[in-house]
Amino acid sequence: MAVTKLILFASALLLTALFIGVNASRSNETWHEHAVENPDEVAAMVDMSIRNSTERRRLGYFSCATGNPIDDCWRCDRKWQLRRKRLADCSIGFGRNAIGGRDGRFYVVTDPGDDDPVNPIPGTLRHAVIQDEPLWIIFKRDMVITLKQELIMNSFKTIDGRGVNVHIANGACLTIQYVTNIIVHGIHVHDCKPTGNAMVRSSPSHYGFRSMADGDAISIFGSSHIWIDHNSLSNCADGLVDAVMSSTAITVSNNFFTHHNEVMLLGHSDSYTRDKVMQVTIAYNHFGEGLIQRMPRCRHGYFHVVNNDYTHWEMYAIGGSAGPTINSQGNRFLAPVNPFAKEVTKREYTGESKWKHWNWRSEGDLFLNGAFFTRSGAGAGANYARASSLSAKSSSLVGTMTSYSGALNCRAGRRC
């Protein structure tokens, strides 16, 4: 009877959340079509998923659960390889609606080559990502893919590296430009180089000249509904994850970042005010060894930094300019030994008379080895509504929730 009541109660909460989402009125008619109008709805639904996973754990269904709602949604399934597309229902935060190639067929990459970026060979990753149809892209075997030019992705694609060891390395890397519904999961991306001044195909019917690319691991440009999850990213020429030019509805989760200078840029420039539509969730990531700054570095928009583990930085962890709203909740910050680098935050190119009005708050964060967060602006929760995307858990649980960050060593027939 108690279990029945719990299920009925959870169902009622879900119906209520959906009713709120359907009937929420648009508060700003000029607001970007992909931005979240009711972040409280997002937080309520994610909070429900956390409670549900906890209840299942209590009932014995998920003895391997960690409290990380993304992982608890799929990782305990021994038959995950037979239900790969279930992953698309597990996203949270602002990028929660990214379905990738869920509604399409599977495409198996069999060839690691990239001989011709204009006429890619069937079976290559480039041939897969440029197709117009939705595709869930998987890999036949372990492989290292060295791209000659940017891998320009078409909409409704999932790159799923689970079950094999896939590296995109030592060449060009991923470009997500003017597209929607992309999932990148379970791959290693490292040692990316600047490339360009070349012709590159972006769809079956189009190719064109590309100027020089910066050498980002993952570049998100003018795109929406993007989910970057469980990847290992390091040592690229520019950024590891950069999102610019009105990109929004993005979740960056469960990634392992190492050995890099400028880790994550969110916002094109101080003068590009169209990035005010940007909403990004940064959750359950491990910012690890050899990192220097920009975890992330934000401009203009709304950024929810929640339940991440910051174990290394040399300059600062979270920075920004041009008045972004930053909502830091339940993170663990371990400051470096350097006594002049203990501060988590950095305001770029702006005096205190201006940045004191920016809404930057720290709530429930854990500060170790002298780390500290300089708050500014309003403290009230209402001012952070557009920078709220999920319910933070206690910072004491961060170590457990991020312990499997990065590309996972998944094997068929075993819990991932």
From Swiss-Prot:
Stretch forming the signal peptide: 1-24
Pathway the protein takes part in: Glycan metabolism; pectin degradation; 2-dehydro-3-deoxy-D-gluconate from pectin: step 2/5
Record's keyword terms, sorted: Calcium, Glycoprotein, Lyase, Metal-binding, Signal
Active site: residue positions: R294
Keyword Signal among record annotations: yes
Protein's GO biological process: pectin catabolic process
Enzyme class: lyase
Catalytic reaction annotation: Eliminative cleavage of (1->4)-alpha-D-galacturonan to give oligosaccharides with 4-deoxy-alpha-D-galact-4-enuronosyl groups at their non-reducing ends
Annotated Pfam families: Pectate_lyase_4
Gene3D superfamilies in the cross-refs: Single-stranded right-handed beta-helix, Pectin lyase-like
Chain positions recorded as Ca(2+) binding sites: D214, D238, D242
InterPro entries linked to this entry: AmbAllergen (IPR018082), Pec_lyase (IPR002022), Pectin_lyas_fold (IPR012334), Pectin_lyase_fold/virulence (IPR011050), PEL (IPR045032)
Cofactor(s) this protein cannot do without: Ca(2+)
Enzyme Commission designation: 4.2.2.2
GO molecular function: metal ion binding; pectate lyase activity
Assigned protein family: Belongs to the polysaccharide lyase 1 family.
Name this polypeptide is given: Probable pectate lyase 8
Organism: Arabidopsis thaliana (Mouse-ear cress)
